[in-house]
Amino acid sequence: MNPRRKSRLTIILFVLLGVTIASSLVLYALRQNIDLFYTPSEVISGKNDDPDTIPEVGQRIRVGGMVVEGTVKRDPNSLKVSFNVNDIGPEITVEYEGILPDLFREGQGIVAQGVLKEPKLLEATEVLAKHDENYVPPDLSEKMEQVHKPMGISNQDMQGESDRDRLDKAVNSVEEGKK
């Protein structure tokens, strides 16, 4: 190999090494700004029930779920609010200091972004409320569909009408027919 080719190869290798190092540093810096989305069940048991995917305490995450009825507690001396959020399973507690969105209320869907302070405690820096009464965060609705369909829960069950309700209606109509 002549000296000219050798110097070109050396320059190319140093440029590639520099680009690789710069790319690695950029990706490492961005890693801290990426907020992964979890449901409350995934915060506790991991994505797809894999314990290796449970978020670590101190990690920035986004949690989407429904505000549990009767769990909203407001500090009378400040803007601190705490409430529980669940999807179809366990609950986690969210603490937030600030003004909540106008559409925030119990029983409604929210997405909270913040830092996981304890395995079941999220210190939120931002709380986003749903848009209307039919809104459910997309990831949460997918998870609910995955859980409800295999269990044999029908759309009527999801709307509050169970097999027992349908059976009671049928029995009542038969009894009325006998009269």
Swiss-Prot record:
Residue ranges annotated as Cytoplasmic topological domain: 1-8
Ranges per topology, Periplasmic: 30-179
Keyword Oxidoreductase: no
Recorded topology in the membrane: Single-pass type II membrane protein
Stretches that traverse the bilayer: 9-29
Compositional bias (Basic and acidic residues): 138-148, 161-179
Entry's Gene Ontology BP terms: cytochrome complex assembly
Highest rank taxon of the organism: Bacteria
Region (Disordered): 138-179
UniProt cross-references to InterPro entries, sorted A to Z: CcmE, CcmE-like_sf, NA-bd_OB-fold
PANTHER family xref list: CYTOCHROME C-TYPE BIOGENESIS PROTEIN CCME HOMOLOG, MITOCHONDRIAL
This protein's name: Cytochrome c-type biogenesis protein CcmE
Gene: ccmE
